Amino acid sequence: MHREVCENFTLHQEGVVTTASAINGLLLALTMAVAQGKECKGVNFPDQVEVGGSDLTLNGLGLQKATFLRVDVYVAALYVTVTSHDPNSLINSDGPQELIVHFLRNVGVEDVRKQWSRDFAHVAPDRPVSLMQRVATLNAWLSDVKRDERLTFIRQPGEGVQVIVNGVVKGTIPGDDFSRDFMSIWLGAAPPSPELRRGLLGGKCD
């Protein structure tokens, strides 16, 4: 009798341990799935980030290729408060946004600066002096970019665009006009490439 009770107790314990192990395994799998987020060209981005106490959701990942050689240059990730496929609603959003640019190859600083100047000239053809002064400030904060380095831009309505280079905060470029022009570069009528824009709006990253 005592032996049977002991055996039953042991089996019960084993059942509890097995069940607990299964639950722990499931929780670990779910945690890893959440942590993995989305991937493009071997670069992983989380599904959510926190900016100034606000939870932002990944709207899309876009891939930028070199114009002529068609080699991969960078993957960009756009985080927003409310996801959307409408570029105008994102450009004119009154909520915070974060754009992360993860480079897939080395790029010289002069190439980066020339691209910014061209991009802002497209979205603001009248080129007001105040805007171009702020573009000059942005360019002054940049340097040669190496593979796997990141530029992060945090848009805060009423404040402007905070610029972070490889985790180092460079400063904030003020003005809602600048922040709208900045988002128009990526989502407007003349983006660096149609494929990049499509990806940031929720399409395929390829």
Task: Give the role of each language-model region.
Residues 27-36:
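Hydrophobic h-region of N-terminal signal peptides that target proteins for export
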Residues 1-19:
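N-terminal secretory signal peptides that target proteins for export/translocation
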Residues 165-167:
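Short strand-turn-strand beta-turns centered on an Asx-Gly dipeptide
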